């Protein structure tokens, strides 16, 4: 970790030069979030300096936001908001890297469909209206198509309850801005999609993580939090959860919905992965339609470049959501709406999703074969998998070791709500590999590391 550490040759005090040297390794990605730095005495002994100097250097690093001290756990590399692993949406262009850290569909079916669709758009009767302003909720014809698409899942086909957004993340931002005030408490799984953490920080909301098990959020923990914290809302990813891949059973959904109903807590349902799911389970919007804001979109199931999302909300709050969107962008691009509406209306969206599911099944089969000996949590049509690491690996150290060998994965710390490390695991995105061969190669490297059964020796020697 701090092998062969050399202090800069300048006139600054030794503690500042030590802080600079460690900070440089963090900036280069040699030290990643969650890794524990060696004890002060060990560093002092290896560099021939006194312990007080090391302590002052660590304090300087804390002031820079690069490390954090945790009682009983020592000093850890901090997870920075700007760090690549904390909220990443684009694959790395690093040469030779098979980047499985980004969640993306596994095929180019959307690109092929778009090439066929674009020449036809100018003949669409709605094309003439593309240069006009549209209501903040979105063009009426697009809302009708979206309501039909979501019928049976949310909204019962009622276009009047649909707001169209520039993707699900934009929808989530509008919902939080519309329905929560600075300082309000939002509940979520203790490990969950990073986007909710980023939004709560930016909007001054107090995000609290609740205990989970292999079936998702625990109803008893939700009940206790509602009784003591008086939360404004609970955020849930009920289908193919990101990152754990858990799909809440109907019983678990009903139990959580009952708690929300007893305490009048709004349910924010992020259901972007539902189209990939190969079974039917009632949504929270179906179980508690007047207490649930349902968010979905096409980016995860069709293509990330198709920034098109849906918010289905109770009529009592729909106007607030639309007003929040209007402040953002007035309304979504009608051109994007026309592209997406055509895909929904002519069945192309369904065909693309079928292709994605089949490709994911092939990739899941490779995963089961190569990592058969390890504790992998996943689902037949999930675009990602959650690898529980054996002793003595920790998420950040394993992600670093993988990257050094040409494979990108995301450690559990990137998904943690709060500052505690709650799982020693990494997320592996199966759809991100350019080909089945690349996926097999990357998984083989991961298996080789796991079979090695040991961490690199860390320390300043």
Please give the residue ranges for each predicted region:
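N-terminal basic, amphipathic alpha-helical segments
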Residues: 1-122, 126, 131, 142-144, ...
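Conserved core of the PLP fold type I
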Residues: 129-263, 274-293, 451-460
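Active-site PLP attachment segment
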Residues: 72, 288-320, 332-335
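Conserved glycine-rich beta-strand-loop-beta hairpin in the small C-terminal domain of fold type I
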Residues: 357-368, 376-389
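Short hydrophobic/aromatic beta-strand micro-patches
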Residues: 312, 386-388, 429-431
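Hydrophobic residues in well-ordered beta-strands that form the structural core
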Residues: 188, 209, 267-269, 340, ...
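Amphipathic alpha-helix from the class-I
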Residues: 316-320, 338-355
């Amino acid at each position: 970790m701090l092998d062969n550490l050399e202090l800069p040759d300048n006139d600054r005090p030794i503690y500042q030069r030590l802080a600079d040297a460690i900070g440089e390794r963090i900036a280069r990605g040699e030290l990643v979030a969650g890794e524990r730095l060696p004890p002060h005495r060990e560093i002092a002994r290896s560099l021939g300096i006194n312990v007080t100097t090391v302590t002052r250097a660590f304090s300087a690093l804390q002031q820079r936001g690069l490390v954090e001290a945790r009682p009983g756990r020592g000093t850890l590399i901090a997870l920075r908001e700007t760090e690549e692993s904390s909220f990443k949406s684009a694959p790395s262009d690093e040469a030779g890297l098979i980047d499985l850290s980004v969640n993306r569909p596994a095929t180019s079916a959307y690109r092929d469909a778009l090439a066929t669709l674009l020449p036809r758009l100018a003949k669409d009767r709605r094309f003439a209206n593309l240069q006009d302003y549209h209501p903040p909720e979105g063009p009426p014809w697009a809302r009708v198509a979206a309501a039909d698409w979501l019928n049976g899942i949310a909204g019962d086909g009622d276009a009047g309850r649909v707001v169209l957004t520039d993707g699900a993340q934009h929808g989530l931002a509008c919902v939080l801005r519309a329905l929560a005030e600075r300082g309000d408490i939002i509940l979520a799984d203790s490990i969950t999609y990073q986007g909710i953490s980023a939004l709560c920080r930016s909007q001054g909301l107090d995000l609290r993580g609740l205990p989970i098990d292999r079936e998702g959020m625990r109803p008893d923990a939700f009940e206790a939090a509602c009784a003591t914290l008086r939360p404004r809302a609970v955020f849930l990813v009920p289908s193919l959860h990101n990152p754990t891949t858990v799909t809440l059973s109907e019983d678990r959904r009903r139990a959580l919905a009952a708690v929300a109903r007893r305490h009048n807590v709004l349910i924010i349902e992020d259901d972007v992965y539902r189209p990939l799911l190969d079974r039917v389970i009632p949504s929270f919007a179906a179980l508690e339609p007047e207490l649930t804001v349902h968010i979905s979109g096409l980016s995860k199931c069709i293509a990330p470049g198709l920034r098109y999302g849906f918010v289905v909300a109770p009529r009592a709050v729909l106007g607030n959501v639309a007003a929040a969107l209007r402040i953002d962008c007035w309304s979504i691009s009608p051109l994007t709406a026309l592209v997406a509406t055509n895909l929904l209306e002519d069945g192309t969206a369904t065909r693309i999703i079928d292709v994605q599911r089949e490709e994911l099944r092939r990739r899941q089969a490779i995963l089961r074969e190569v990592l058969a000996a390890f504790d992998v949590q996943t689902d037949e049509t999930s675009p990602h998998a959650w690898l529980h690491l054996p002793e003595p690996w920790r998420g950040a150290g394993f992600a670093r070791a993988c990257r050094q060998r040409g494979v990108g994965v995301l450690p559990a710390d990137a998904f943690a709500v709060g500052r505690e490390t709650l799982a020693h695991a990494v997320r592996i995105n199966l759809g991100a590999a350019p080909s089945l061969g690349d996926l097999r190669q990357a998984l083989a490297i991961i298996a080789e590391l796991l079979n090695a059964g040991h961490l690199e020796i860390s320390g300043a020697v």
